[in-house]
Amino acid sequence: MWKEKVQQYEDQIINDLKGLLAIESVRDDAKASEDAPVGPGPRKALDYMYEIAHRDGFTTHDVDHIAGRIEAGKGNDVLGILCHVDVVPAGDGWDSNPFEPVVTEDAIIARGTLDDKGPTIAAYYAIKILEDMNVDWKKRIHMIIGTDEESDWKCTDRYFKTEEMPTLGFAPDAEFPCIHGEKGITTFDLVQNKLAEDQDEPDYELITFKSGERYNMVPDHAEARVLVKENMTDVIQDFEYFLEQNHLQGDSTVDSGILVLTVEGKAVHGMDPSIGVNAGLYLLKFLASLNLDNNAKAFVAFSNRYLFNSDFGEKMGMKFHTDVMGDVTTNIGVITYDNENAGLFGINLRYPEGFEFEKAMDRFANEIQQYGFEVKLGKVQPPHYVDKNDPFVQKLVTAYRNQTNDMTEPYTIGGGTYARNLDKGVAFGAMFSDSEDLMHQKNEYITKKQLFNATSIYLEAIYSLCVEE
């Protein structure tokens, strides 16, 4: 029944999704304003969702242009559906323009198809189809739309300062059948705060180093600019050998007498950096072989001592595991250095329930002082957990099982979704077990089958929660 309903809307779903995907809704602080708190792109995407909601007869409510909601239904209780329309930067290497959606016979290719514009449109159409059916709503629905999920969650922080907390809810921003627990998440900087004079003339001086754009992405590109006093040919040959030995792609060029070294890695979501290749850490590994100036030497040595080849916090003394929620993970997402202001490592750390986060961070901060580094801690989001046997979770899972015959149990993840904003919130789709996960990677796509099946599952789930008693 539900799949047949969705079939009647397939062309509309694709057309509305294409319009949303065409908006480059990447956070841009340089262009932020009161009217566009995280930049014009995210604001434009939020307005786009309001426009299609108004077209279809829904009421909307805007919250300072950084978040808002689409309203449906009636009743005392509220089902929250928490979506986001901001995306991570496209990065390089796409086979098509990431903000000019390509629709093939079986897929749609663009940044945001999986994370989270495709699932957002799927959830929206589930609500729209039920509204078109004139169902007898028993709950209100607030489809809450954020514009800063990929960075600091300013959107939901602002939203829940003044707006009603849903009774229960889900975020269509992960996998089916249901994510009932999420690790704690924090970002912090390790800042080099002690600069040392060079007693002897170094053979090499690190002028600048840059790798990574986001804390929650494994960097796929790194560049170092090095002043080489002598033996430049030897350095280039050693670098080429290093690339070969580590199965890496990279390049070396000379720019106005400065040696420019680049390494290409593999970008993946920061919740599991072990499946990516951190270009920045590899390039620092090579730089450790050079007799650098003292500041750079300390910076590079710190990386190798604490960060390189340590995706689970081993070298930081933070290795920890639980059977329910898994391991601590550490992603070094941003690395910067220049010879005037020294260096910085930007880290995204995720941890399961039971990990003594504050104690571990205090110990680590004290330990690294001797190497000239300090911790600057950002926002901390504690772990989030809902019992998988809760009737709400079971209704979602039943809708999934009815349509897929897949009996996989709900599980927990290292990722962080808007679900953790809710007292009773889970993540629900829209990835299936056979979906290729290219979130935060080049050539991100969603298959039409996945898009329509997710819409159908959301349709049944919302009907079960908000129409049936």
From Swiss-Prot:
Zn(2+) 2 binds at H84, D115, D173. InterPro entries: Bact_exopeptidase_dim_dom, M20A_pepV-rel, Peptidase_M20, Peptidase_M20_dimer, Peptidase_M20A. Its EC number is 3.4.13.-. Binds 2 Zn(2+) ions per subunit. Its cofactor is Zn(2+). The keyword Metal-binding applies. Pfam families: M20_dimer, Peptidase_M20. One of its GO terms (biological process) is proteolysis. SUPFAM superfamilies: Bacterial exopeptidase dimerisation domain, Zn-dependent exopeptidases. This is Putative dipeptidase SAR1836. It comes from Staphylococcus aureus (strain MRSA252).
